[in-house]
Amino acid sequence: MTLEINFDGLIGPTHNYAGLSLGNIASHSNAGAVSSPRAAALQGLTKMRTLLDLGLTQGFLPPPPRPAAHVLRRLGFKGSDQAVLAQVADEDLDLLRAASSASSMWTANAATVLAAPDTADGRVHLVTANLGTMLHRSLEADDTYATLRRVFSGEAFAVHAPLPFAAHLGDEGAANHMRLAANHGARGVNVFVHGAPRGGRFPERQALRASQAAARLAGVQPTALFAMQSAEAIKAGAFHNDVVAVANANVLLAHPQAFATRPDLLAELSARLPGLVVIETRDLSLEDAVASYLFNSQLVSLPDGYMALIVPVEARDNAAAWREIQTILAADNPVTKVKVVDLRQSMSNGGGPACLRLRVPVAAAARDQINPAFLLDHARLDRLTRLVETWWPRAIAPSDLTDPALWEAAMVAHAALETFLTAPTV
């Protein structure tokens, strides 16, 4: 039996609101606000608990060390971690902000995952995203690659290095990829969504060439579909496809303006996948879709064969979005349950439930090859929660990013997390 494991990003101890992400309306709207790293991480852990309580398998990916002194040394800064960070704080504050970002929490951007039934060699392929469009995100790529190799080291997995960093190869991972299939173990249709051609108001975060490369590396290109995100969606603030569309098994939930070539895409999907269920929200504006992050919900398969939507509180608080959710629940489709989660700390930086997780479909044999340190049950989740409550800072103001005390606190928190990861799991 094949199941899907959600690997959520643990929100790191330097979570802050530096407003680093062009095209991300929430990020810019909240730039300069005081963040709460401890509350942010606890909110994420509560979401993980919600999935466990639904009977699903849950994993997590740890944040890389931040501030990233190890990366800054590659730029010529020398000395101890504290000395390196002090130099950067004095010479290039924007670079320090980028090196302090906790944006690795959004593991939907960690990699593109291609399921074993679809790939040329029958392995699960993870193509690490280069995240080359944004400086702060690009600093994650090598760390993410190392983490993925640590988690998925078995022969059932193929973890690919990030694509070369180039203007026309920007790759932002699973946030721009959807897989549709009769079930997680069946052969599926991989849909790669890329941005509009360069020259618009916001940057092309996902390049067509990058999507083609990911498909080629996993051997799914001959059967893959490539669709362009609509310019209207991007202008409205949908900087990734997962802000306007989400798919699970044979269900596609999408805004009618999500794709530039919607009729052709839906026709091709219907032809390839008998039993496809398309749910479109015809009474929800793009503005409400982005404000509520309805489509950035997690759509998950439940043990009883039905599906649940994991939505942010913003979707409940937006009247138009909540009406659409009730309509979905009342209609004839597999979605029978909705769970509301509070992710305000992440949402204020533009990341909802779907941003915070990387979906990895695995058969039983492959699951046994996953490093157990990164899988959670309720007891391990309790331990991780206590760790965050002990070591994560309560608050970070913009000026705190230059404070050596914060750098030291973050290093201590990361050391405690590494101790958790290397301790026996049974």
UniProtKB/Swiss-Prot annotation:
Catalytic center residues: 172, 240, 355
GO molecular function (one): N-succinylarginine dihydrolase activity
Signal peptide as annotated in the record: none
Top EC category: hydrolase
Pathway: Amino-acid degradation; L-arginine degradation via AST pathway; L-glutamate and succinate from L-arginine: step 2/5
GO biological process, one term: arginine catabolic process to glutamate
EC nos: 3.5.3.23
Binding site for substrate: 18-27, 109, 136-137, 205, 242, 349
Catalytic activity, reaction form: N(2)-succinyl-L-arginine + 2 H2O + 2 H(+) = N(2)-succinyl-L-ornithine + 2 NH4(+) + CO2
Record InterPro entries: AstB_sf (IPR037031), SuccinylArg_d-Hdrlase_AstB (IPR007079)
Alphabetic keyword roster: Arginine metabolism, Hydrolase
Superkingdom of this protein's organism: Bacteria
Database matches in HAMAP family: AstB
Cross-referenced PANTHER family: N-SUCCINYLARGININE DIHYDROLASE
Role played: Catalyzes the hydrolysis of N(2)-succinylarginine into N(2)-succinylornithine, ammonia and CO(2).
Name of protein: N-succinylarginine dihydrolase 1
Organism: Caulobacter vibrioides (strain ATCC 19089 / CIP 103742 / CB 15)
Gene: astB1
